Amino acid sequence: MVLSAISVIILGFLVAYGLLGYLFGFAYTSIIVTGALAFVTFFTIIQWLLGPLMIKAAYRLIEVKADDPTYGWVYNLVQEVATYNNMSMPKVYVAPVNFPNAFAFSSPLFGKNMAITTPLINILNKDEIKAVIGHEIGHLRHRDTEILLAVSLIPTLMYWLGYSLWWGGLLGGGGGGRNSNSGLLFLIGIVLIAVSFVFNIFVLFLNRMREAYADVNSALTIPNGASNLQTALAKIVIYTDPGIVDRVKQKSGGVAKMLLFSGTDVSNEEIPSYKAQELVNYWRTQKVGILSDLFSDHPHPAKRIKLLDKFTQAQWSPVA
């Protein structure tokens, strides 16, 4: 997937370079296309290599070791799940922030990493935490960070190339080109910008696919992973929207989307499983449209629950 994305980027670069060089002159085109490519590639590589540093700073991550008196058991859970997945142990962090979440990130310089926020640790039981870890380990196993970063290069490059051509058209084109048609240059820029936004919808779709794939990884490699991940997802939503269960009972109001966090001051204790199960049962019967999560990077919760239902009776087994 990564190599395919890189191939598409290179091919698109060559096609754009040839077409624009023919229309507007290769000297002018070289400045625009090469400049846009260099700009996007440079900042993407920096983001990939140094991203973990930015994440650690933004979330104030605290590294956890096996002998940690407070969170050593979290380290042990990650180690257990990594063993199930036949994967090397990632670095484990706890994030002292005010919303429940877990996330994995990696780079060639800083290796594989996983972070869990303190509210998530507080509101889930250990089996549910293990299922969430199985989801995040799935992201690391499948190299989702690298795949999504490579694919997202395509619309980013399209946008900046289009933006450069748009300004080139406004400023009068290349001057020495075959046609010196600034209007056509402007039009090509607008089209590329529009296509970049459309392609971003595909990137979101791919992101949702990777999330679903990570859910399946947890279901297949963790004992009772599917059912525990279901209640974990429900508890996260209940934490961010405490009134959702009552609204579901009354059949009024919508369901909160996954990972829409708020600063609501709610109990920082484990959420009762029966409340989570009520929400899971509602999602099982909720009808959601194809476009319900079109602009989201996560599948609608109801879709995730229904997918996990297919694996609740599956025989789990460690990865060979």
Curated annotation (Swiss-Prot):
Which residue spans traverse the membrane?
6-26, 31-51, 147-167, 185-205
Residues reported to bind Zn(2+): H135, H139, E211
Q: How does it sit in the membrane?
A: Multi-pass membrane protein
Q: Per its Swiss-Prot or TrEMBL entry, what cofactor is needed?
A: Zn(2+)
Going by the UniProt record, its keywords in alphabetical order are: Cell membrane, Hydrolase, Membrane, Metal-binding, Metalloprotease, Protease, Transmembrane, Transmembrane helix, Zinc
The answer to whether keyword Metal-binding applies is: yes
Name the Pfam families on file. Answer: Peptidase_M48
Gene Ontology molecular function, alphabetical: metalloendopeptidase activity; zinc ion binding
For this record, an example GO cellular component is:
plasma membrane
The record's active-site residues are: E136
Q: In the record, which residues are listed under signal peptide? A: none
What biological-process terms (Gene Ontology) are attached?
proteolysis
> What protein family does this chain belong to?
Belongs to the peptidase M48B family.
This entry's comment on the bound cofactor is:
Binds 1 zinc ion per subunit.
Protein name (database record) = Protease HtpX homolog 2
